Amino acid sequence: MTMVEHYPFKIHSDFEPQGDQPQAIKEIVDGIKAGKRHQTLLGATGTGKTFTMSNVIKEVGKPTLIIAHNKTLAGQLYSEFKEFFPENRVEYFVSYYDYYQPEAYVPSTDTFIEKDASINDEIDQLRHSATSALFERDDVIIIASVSCIYGLGNPEEYKDLVVSVRVGMEMDRSELLRKLVDVQYTRNDIDFQRGTFRVRGDVVEIFPASKEELCIRVEFFGDEIDRIREVNYLTGEVLKEREHFAIFPASHFVTREEKLKVAIERIEKELEERLKELRDENKLLEAQRLEQRTNYDLEMMREMGFCSGIENYSVHLTLRPLGSTPYTLLDYFGDDWLVMIDESHVTLPQVRGMYNGDRARKQVLVDHGFRLPSALDNRPLKFEEFEEKTKQLVYVSATPGPYEIEHTDKMVEQIIRPTGLLDPKIEVRPTENQIDDLLSEIQTRVERNERVLVTTLTKKMSEDLTTYMKEAGIKVNYLHSEIKTLERIEIIRDLRMGTYDVIVGINLLREGIDIPEVSLVVILDADKEGFLRSNRSLIQTIGRAARNDKGEVIMYADKMTDSMKYAIDETQRRREIQMKHNEKHGITPKTINKKIHDLISATVENDENNDKAQTVIPKKMTKKERQKTIDNIEKEMKQAAKDLDFEKATELRDMLFELKAEG
């Protein structure tokens, strides 16, 4: 058993909260202390929401889970929080699959697709680091994607199976080795890696699953632990002496031997009942398939203690009743903790939708004899269960969704940007002669070396408009969903560099389109109500022009819809608040100068002057060149992950998939 140690949260920053940040921090902190369950931070683009969240965590002093809606965003937040809290445990918990094809069955073609996955070892290490941190200290911030609501092993079992070693403790070497094997560590004296241990005489070296380069050297003197040291596993350099060390299990799905026996009996009983059911329905093929697959898994469990796809038996392994709520990362937090949901208008619907998608796929597998019905219990949480498990939540969004609005009695607003930048001016113009009018507006921006985003409603309109603009001599490109990640990043970069002056697209709300050079956003068909022209989408689109001090938005429409009116009024309200603040403090709005990164690059061996020259990937390559480029990108991706630059690593990974697919 390990004791949770107490440490205060300490922020490292050159800045103090300013603008309306102090007020927002105070309101949220007071709300949490008063026991409020739901609060929403309505933070406009560029107002420093992350800094506000950090200050709230520091004041409240509770372990905190921050959920983002994708890995890229989680990686970005992880880097930012790590900078703010270098002395505290900031952890990263996302799906460890670089690539994941879940097992599935297509009845119409009688095709079974085996589970195929590539696990990222570094992310697996970070997941172990996150869960073990929660049992070691209370100053923990975990940045997670929605994968935190997926099944994980029993936290009590995980905690109880910790192997605790202490100097002076009576324990012989073979007892330690036995305990390590029980928690799924394997002995490997040659290939020493995470989750293994090696033995040299009276010295046992253990590579914990939660560590990256650090192993633990335990030295014995007879039946007593004589010395414990932290060692660099590569160089053998001793880093520090330890009095005590807790070794957490190498897997989150770890089960004691006596429990495994009970679990196997339960699986056999369920198999017997299910086979009878299938045979009674004359589904003989399905029955044979299920019997064969399950018996193979059971044999593996008896011999090895685990099997491939063991998570499908999690309800039995944790001895829970069928249909009960699975254990997830949320259960690893204690009783008093905090949840923050970033971009909640996107993240909450994602949390809500996870269960149904997963259920539909697994039901087909169960119906056709690929899995036992209990496999349905290896699932993400239902939304109601998520609500039940979370005690206090802070939603963070520039455009809160219906759930947040319904559950929060009063929004905590953060409208003022420390940079003084105002929300853009909005003008509504009639659709008559809109294209000629648009061209003259673009011309004005081009002369000032500024960029333009144009959003349309249909793919055809985007294509036609792009062609028309090209014929009119405008440097324009078209961004649509079929464009690969690689090209997409390249197009945005080229817009910033001035290769293009205009980008035309349908949904320009995806992350990565915050471009300070954009001074004009044009919304065509603004009066056509629908998902892309809802008040939330309009406010988000308008926000794309809020990073430039000359930011303007033109909506072409023949009538004023409720969504337009709301978006215009809200933008004007925020604009006035910022203007008053600027006037009071003598701030002059200034466009943010954001460095243009060359992400579309593969590190290549180049001339002596340039150690890390980066080349743009050529469009046509020989097989040999392609392989060399793939190797280079892979190297760069691993380096980026090591440097905790997950945003870059994710983009490089997507590039890698595309290059491999093209090969």
UniProtKB/Swiss-Prot annotation:
Subcellular localization(s) per the UniProt record: Cytoplasm
Motif Beta-hairpin, residue numbers: 96-119
Cellular component terms (Gene Ontology): cytoplasm; excinuclease repair complex
SMART domains xref list: DEXDc, HELICc
GO biological process: nucleotide-excision repair; SOS response
Residue ranges annotated for the Helicase C-terminal domain, each copy included: 434-600
Domain UVR as annotated: residue spans: 627-662
InterPro entries, A to Z: Helicase/UvrB_N, Helicase_ATP-bd, Helicase_C-like, P-loop_NTPase, UVR_dom, UVR_dom_sf, UvrB, UvrB_inter
CDD domains from the UniProt entry: DEXHc_UvrB (cd17916), SF2_C_UvrB (cd18790)
Claim: Repeat is one of the keywords in the record: no
Ranges for domain Helicase ATP-binding: 30-417
PROSITE patterns in the cross-refs: HELICASE_ATP_BIND_1, HELICASE_CTER, UVR
GO MF annotation, one: ATP hydrolysis activity
Reported function: The UvrABC repair system catalyzes the recognition and processing of DNA lesions. A damage recognition complex composed of 2 UvrA and 2 UvrB subunits scans DNA for abnormalities. Upon binding of the UvrA(2)B(2) complex to a putative damaged site, the DNA wraps around one UvrB monomer. DNA wrap is dependent on ATP binding by UvrB and probably causes local melting of the DNA helix, facilitating insertion of UvrB beta-hairpin between the DNA strands. Then UvrB probes one DNA strand for the presence of a lesion.
Domain notes: The beta-hairpin motif is involved in DNA binding.
Subunit structure: Forms a heterotetramer with UvrA during the search for lesions. Interacts with UvrC in an incision complex.
HAMAP family (UniProt xref): UvrB
Sequence similarity: Belongs to the UvrB family.
Database matches in NCBIfam families: PRK05298.1, uvrb
Protein name: UvrABC system protein B
Annotated organism of origin: Staphylococcus aureus (strain Mu50 / ATCC 700699)
